[in-house]
Amino acid sequence: AQPTDQQMDARSFLSEEMIAEFKAAFDMFDTDGGGDISTKELGTVMRMLGQTPTKEELDAIIEEVDEDGSGTIDFEEFLVMMVRQMKEDAQGKSEEELAECFRIFDKNADGYIDSEELGEILRSSGESITDEEIEELMKDGDKNNDGKIDFDEFLKMMEGVQ
């Protein structure tokens, strides 16, 4: 079978080491060497790989991945699913982390980052950056042109960075 676009995307998202690690975990549960594992074992394999799906998430994942209802998942389907979980985890985490960053950067706690605060942040991270560059970043980030960056604008700026 030809790999689907999703499967190719999943492989390109992962490093060779990660694929090998996932394969090793997958193979432990592929007891008959048939190249697939039971959906019942999926949660165990995911937890071995550091994921923590809830029962509901797991059911939703199985329903999505086991399209033919065979009760089994092959390795390519497994990769797609792991990548999806990793991306969702990263998104959830990064928003919390960014909210935390925003609070730290917003020195006077007015709910905005101004160009002075932005300059401090960038310089403290070891960037050698000119005032012109800071103004440029402010202009790019400040979508409503009020001279300061609110949390939504900050999130959009950071999306561009990641």
Curated annotation (Swiss-Prot):
Binding site for Ca(2+) 2: 66, 68, 70, 72, 77
Disulfide bonds: none
GO-annotated cellular components: myosin II complex
InterPro entries according to UniProt: CALM/Myosin/TropC-like, EF-hand-dom_pair, EF_Hand_1_Ca_BS, EF_hand_dom
Record protein name field: Troponin C, skeletal muscle
Additional comment: Skeletal muscle troponin C binds four calcium ions.
Keywords, ordered alphabetically: Acetylation, Calcium, Metal-binding, Muscle protein, Repeat
Location of the EF-hand domain: 17-52, 53-88, 93-128, 129-162
Pfam families: EF-hand_7
Protein function: Troponin is the central regulatory protein of striated muscle contraction. Tn consists of three components: Tn-I which is the inhibitor of actomyosin ATPase, Tn-T which contains the binding site for tropomyosin and Tn-C. The binding of calcium to Tn-C abolishes the inhibitory action of Tn on actin filaments.
Residues that hold Ca(2+) 3 according to the record: 106, 108, 110, 112, 117
One function term, GO molecular function aspect: calcium ion binding
Binding site for Ca(2+) 1: 30, 32, 36, 41
Tagged with keyword Calcium: yes
Species in which this protein is naturally found: Pelophylax lessonae (Pool frog)
Residues annotated for Ca(2+) 4 binding in this entry: 142, 144, 146, 148, 153
